[in-house]
Each structure stands twice: as C-alpha cells, then as structure tokens.
C-alpha cells in the first residue's frame, strides 16, 4: 500500500514540475524585450547608421556662422588657423548630461590654448538659455552658440544620430574636431551622454603631432 502511495506521489510531483516548466518556457517565449533606453529614459535608436558621420571625416567641414548670446559671430572661415571642437547637443532639455559636458569643456585647462576654440552648439533661443545659466551659473563660462532652426546641425548630419532624443529634429550628444585647415578629423556620437574631455584632448594632441 505504501509503495502505491509513494509511486502516486512521485507521479504527481513529476506532473507538477512538468507543468511549471511549461509555464515558465511559454512565458519566456512570449516575453517582449524592453527597448534599450538612455539615461533620460528615452529609447535608444538602434538602427541608426554611423555612416553619414564617418563620411564627413577627413573632408572639409560644412561652412557655419553661429552667434553667442552677446551676438558675437563664430564662423569657420574666421576660425581658420585654430583647432575647433564643436559639441552639438540639445541644450535646455538635456539636463544634466549636456550641461555638465558644456561646463566641463569650459573649465578644462587643456582647451584654453589660444590655438583651440570650443563651441557648444545648442538649438535654444538665446533668451531662453539664460534660464540654464540661472540654474547652473558655471554655464556662463562656456562659449555657447545658437543654431537657429537646427540648420547647422542638419548640415553636419547631427539630427539623425543614435544620441538624439528627438530623432530627425534635434541633435543629441555629438563631438566634432576640426583642424586648422577646416578639415573634420574626428567625430564621436555618444548615446550614453558621458563626459569626453580626455578623448577630445587626445584627438587634439594627434593634430599637434602632425
């Protein structure tokens, strides 16, 4: 009698384990993977090709002329003879990542050489940018220029990068290094929106050795 009970118990246990296994397998099979998101909780565009950016490297930079909040114009033509760092970003809406990078660039002694110009390119109206300075006063130390209607960002293929939180409309978190002859030597797009001063300094060091 006990043997019959033990056999029945074993059979029941096997059936239960098998049923649980089927439920787990079925659940994992039907599970939809959550999309990768950036630090702002926005989906990262995974099908974005870096080809348009790579095609700009070692070619003459698109012409630009951008003004800071005081109306001073910074143009590619007038900056010939200097190495240029352009940091294309979303500006006001990209807090704190883009703001932190803008401040980091402004405070870095390695970029205060007279042969180097660092421009943080935002798409906000100049009057609106004052709100950011009020919230983070260190931003006043940076050279921020304003890209009306994102026209220059578009010329540099900055509106369809993996870092763009508003794909096709606004830039994200992308760096461009232009040499003294106006040729693009380095482009880096970062969906993680980290600080990249060391990488930029290394790229400028390469230019000084050429």
Regions found by a protein language model. Name each.
Residues 74-105:
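Short active-site neighborhood of thiol/selenol oxidoreductases, capturing the structured segment around
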Residues 61-62, 83, 172-174:
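Short loop/turn microsegments at loop-to-beta-strand junctions
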Residues 1-60, 210:
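N-terminal targeting signals for export/organelle localization
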Residues 167-210:
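Thiol-/selenol-based redox modules, centered on thioredoxin-like
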């Amino acid at each position: 009698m006990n043997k019959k009970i033990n056999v029945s118990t074993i059979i029941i246990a096997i059936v239960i384990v098998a049923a649980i296994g089927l439920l787990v397998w079925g659940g994992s099979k039907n599970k939809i993977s959550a999309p990768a998101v950036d630090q702002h909780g926005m989906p990262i565009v995974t099908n974005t090709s870096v080809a348009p950016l790579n095609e700009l490297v070692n070619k003459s930079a698109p012409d630009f002329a951008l003004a800071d909040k005081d109306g001073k114009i910074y143009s590619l033509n007038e900056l010939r003879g200097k190495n240029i760092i352009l940091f294309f970003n979303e500006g006001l809406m990209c807090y704190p990542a883009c703001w932190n990078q803008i401040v980091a660039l402004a405070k870095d002694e390695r970029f205060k050489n007279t042969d180097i110009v660092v421009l943080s390119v935002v798409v906000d109206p100049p009057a609106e940018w004052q709100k950011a300075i009020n919230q983070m006063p260190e931003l006043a130390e940076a050279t921020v220029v304003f890209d009306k209607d994102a026209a220059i960002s578009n010329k540099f293929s900055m509106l369809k990068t993996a870092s763009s939180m508003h794909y096709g409309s606004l830039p994200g978190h992308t760096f461009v290094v232009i040499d003294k002859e106006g040729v693009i030597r380095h482009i880096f797009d970062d969906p993680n929106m980290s600080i990249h001063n060391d990488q930029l300094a290394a790229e400028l060091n390469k230019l000084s050795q050429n």
